[in-house]
């Protein structure tokens, strides 16, 4: 199916269950300043960097093209990380500004985006990206540190969730999930 057909499939799924796509973003997103689905989507795209998107995959679909592949699915934390694991991810980078105390089936590095969250929920965190905003590290330095952590994690270093014994899964239900 084409990218547009896949997008229409997701939109049809929402409509068939009497839901409006624009009920997303979640209350937590709204508290953080995201007001529309477009705002949330722009944030997702920015996290992909500057590489061109080579394919849009169905939920839990496995990549067969080299490059940046986008995976269709809901923004729900546990459902999306379960889908990434089913798609074959070996390490997941999960950025959060509010903190989410869960563990996915694959090692999931929690990347905290602000110092306040790190101060209050340090045992949930794997990487503090808030050091960029505080000026403690440059973007390049933090990127290098995160890259090293990804390599260590892929080589067997446990994530914070794994050390706490958290290994939840959540399969996308037949219906709308925010």
What positions do the PLM features span?
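Single conserved hydrophobic/aromatic residue that forms the stacking wall/gate
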Residues: 1-10
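Short glycine/threonine-rich loop-to-helix capping motif typified by GTGT followed
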Residues: 4, 34-42, 103-108, 171-178
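Conserved structured core elements
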Residues: 4, 74-78, 144
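Flexible, glycine/charged-enriched surface loops at secondary-structure junctions
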Residues: 14-31, 157-169
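Active-site rim loops that border cofactor/substrate pockets in soluble metabolic enzymes
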Residues: 23-79
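Hydrophobic alpha-helical bundle architecture
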Residues: 56-119, 131-135
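Extended hydrophobic packing segments that form well-structured cores
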Residues: 88-90, 95, 106, 129, ...
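Gly/His-enriched, cation/cofactor- and phosphate-binding structural elements
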Residues: 124
């Amino acid at each position: 199916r084409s990218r547009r057909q896949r997008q229409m499939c997701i939109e049809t799924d929402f409509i068939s269950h009497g839901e409006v796509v624009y009920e997303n973003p979640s209350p937590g997103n709204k508290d953080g300043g995201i007001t529309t689905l477009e705002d949330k989507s722009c944030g997702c795209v920015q996290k992909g960097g500057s590489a061109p998107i080579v394919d849009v995959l169905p939920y839990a679909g496995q990549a067969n093209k080299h490059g940046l592949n986008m995976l269709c699915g809901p923004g729900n934390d546990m459902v999306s990380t379960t889908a990434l694991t089913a798609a074959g991810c070996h390490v997941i980078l999960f950025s959060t500004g509010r903190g989410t105390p869960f563990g996915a089936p694959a090692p999931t590095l929690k990347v905290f985006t602000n110092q306040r969250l790190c101060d209050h929920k340090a045992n949930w965190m794997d990487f503090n990206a808030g050091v960029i905003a505080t000026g403690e590290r440059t973007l390049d330095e933090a990127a290098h540190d995160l890259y090293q952590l990804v390599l260590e994690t892929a080589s067997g270093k446990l994530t914070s969730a794994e050390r706490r014994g958290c290994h939840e899964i959540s399969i996308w239900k037949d219906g709308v999930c925010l």
